[in-house]
A protein has these predicted regions:
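Phosphate/pyrophosphate-binding catalytic cores of soluble transferases and nucleic-acid-acting enzymes
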Residues: 1-315
Length: 315
């Protein structure tokens, strides 16, 4: 059974740079467990590892899928398991790196198996929910989700119509919250390993300060131009790859609906909200928790991760 390291933590905590240093130390390759970095054309806005970092260490599941495609936890778990097996077969060590606690759970524990339901009833519910989404918007449906499955709603962005509809569909079909079914009906994980999960944490003020600075940095790096290119390619603002990170606000700004200053402040708020949702998944995660200080950079972080890894591997 292989030992596999997972480096987890909310967006902006400092995973990418440290993960490259760790991979260089243990002859590893990084497998992204990020629900947005997998999409093509979102390199700047998702703060994907830079080309310089990717030259130093091979990265997988980054910049691979069309942003119009649905990329689910199940798809990630299957792809990641195959990638991990290939890395091991080549004599190297896989590192799973990312901020999606749901994706990490799907890989390490498996996904829930939904009880059977009448296909016709499922189609009717799905069509009715989609019609409501078009008429009422995702915010109204998110409010409804919060009433029937508050735990799932806390982990889902208000703009993430795909996951909102999924939660409401399951509740209408079975009368049980999706999160309850996930606890009761786990399937087998796609790969069996001795997982060493290291969770990076920061004081909330420190994390939010880092996120605010990151948004400014991404805009300076050309994020608005990246959004303009997506618009030119006819990628809609509600495409699966664009939810919850600020692309919708950049689209609104490019269409003259919102000022640049309001766009920037709105994006910063979206990033803080996204980090809150990630943290809700991490609270219950079984992991080696590393509390980082504001001055801790990639080198210090990598050293702490390696200490946890070496302790994990001791007989």
């Amino acid at each position: 059974m292989p030992d596999i390291l997972i480096i987890a933590g909310p967006t902006g905590v400092g995973k990418s740079g440290a993960a490259v240093l760790v991979a260089e130390e243990i002859d590893g390759e990084n497998v992204s467990a990020d629900s947005r970095q997998v999409y093509r054309g979102l390199v700047i806005g998702t703060a994907a590892p830079s080309p310089q970092l990717q030259k130093r260490v091979p990265h997988h599941l980054i910049n691979e899928r069309d942003p119009r495609e649905v990329w689910s936890a199940g798809a990630f778990a299957s792809e990641a398991a195959g990638t991990i097996e290939d890395i091991i077969a080549r004599g190297r060590r896989p590192l799973v790196v990312g901020g999606s606690g749901f994706y990490i759970r799907a890989l390490t524990e498996g996904l829930f198996e939904e009880p059977p339901a009448d296909p016709g009833e499922r189609r009717r519910i799905r069509a009715r929910l989609r019609s409501r989404l078009e008429k009422e918007g995702s915010g109204a449906l998110h409010d409804e989700l919060a009433r029937c499955d508050p735990e799932w709603a806390r982990a889902v962005a208000e703009a993430d119509s795909q996951r909102i509809l999924r939660g409401l569909e399951v509740y209408e079909l079975h009368g049980v919250p999706l999160t309850d079914l996930q606890e009761e009906r786990q399937s087998n994980p796609p790969i069996v390993a001795r997982w060493c999960t290291v969770l990076l944490e920061r004081d909330r003020k420190d994390l939010y300060d880092r996120l605010n600075a990151r948004v400014e940095r991404l805009l300076d790096a050309g994020w608005l131009g990246e959004a303009r290119s997506l618009m030119s390619a006819k990628v809609p603002a509600d495409a699966p790859g664009l939810t919850g990170l600020g692309y919708d606000l950049l689209f609104d700004h490019l269409l003259g609906r919102i000022s640049f200053d309001d766009t920037v402040e709105g994006i910063k708020q979206e990033h803080r909200n996204y980090a809150k949702r990630q943290l809700s998944w991490f609270r219950a995660m079984d992991a080696h928790r590393i509390r980082l200080e504001p001055q801790d950079g990639p080198e210090k972080t990598a050293g702490l991760i390696l200490d946890a890894w070496h302790r994990h591997r001791k007989p």
